[in-house]
A protein has these predicted regions:
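RNA pseudouridine synthases
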Residues: 1-221
């Protein structure tokens, strides 16, 4: 694709993989915010680092986000028109995303489709809880790639993009019933130093030419 490679940003929380007309694709490391959090000590994030490299970027920049614990591919807009176009693609579910995860234990099923509604657990936020009455429906397709007695590697294809969707769908008994390894909210955080969830593939239409673009970043685990 002729990717334009830039040096890693300071402290290496993310790498710029591709610069296109009006957008940039990055690889985010775990334990790093996608957008600013609340408080001055949470200003450092993907958006802030991209603005450092592209000081002439205009508009909101953020098109979508990954959980702070999740690593992998993100696309950000560098112009307002690109932001509108890319945001619309996410809204219309025209963006294809694939994730790799390691789940606790041995998953016997080979794959499936999960349709599970959940909502914010206010007393324990940011945790989400199963809520078939008032929750928002999340839809995820998944398949097993490899399994052992202690862990199962799966590929997730989220159809919707709810916060914590893959984590809830993995952990809940009405989903897969096996939390993602290292999940501090829905599983045993002592099993790994990070959440074993990675955005490995991202496909969308170029905001100017409508050419379909595909990006891959293998999971580091």
């Amino acid at each position: 694709m002729g990717d334009f490679i830039l040096p890693n940003l300071r402290d290496k929380p993310l790498s710029v993989l591709h610069v296109g007309r009006g957008f940039v694709v990055v690889d985010k490391l775990p334990h790093f915010l996608s957008v600013p959090g609340r408080g001055h000590d949470m200003d450092d994030c993907v958006v802030a680092r991209v603005k450092e490299v592209f000081p002439l970027a205009k508009g909101p920049i953020s098109v979508h986000r990954l959980d702070v614990e999740t690593s992998g591919l993100m696309v950000l807009a560098l112009r307002r028109d690109a932001h509108r176009t890319l945001s619309m693609q996410f809204e219309k579910r025209e963006v294809d995303k694939l994730y790799i995860a390691l789940l606790e234990g041995r998953v016997e099923a080979d794959g499936g489709r999960i349709e599970l509604a959940f909502s914010l657990d206010w007393p324990n936020r940011p945790k989400r809880v199963y809520d078939p009455q008032n929750g928002k429906l999340g839809i995820t397709e998944w398949e097993v790639i490899e399994r052992t007695e202690k862990a199962t590697r799966v590929r997730f294809k989220p159809i919707t993009g709810r916060t914590h969707q893959l984590r809830v769908h993995a952990a809940h008994e009405k989903g897969i019933g096996h939390p993602i390894i290292g999940d501090s909210l829905y599983g045993n955080p002592d099993l790994a130093e990070r959440l074993m969830l990675h955005s490995t593939q991202l496909s969308f239409n170029h905001p100017e030419t409508s050419q379909r673009l595909h990006f891959d970043m293998p999971a580091p685990f």
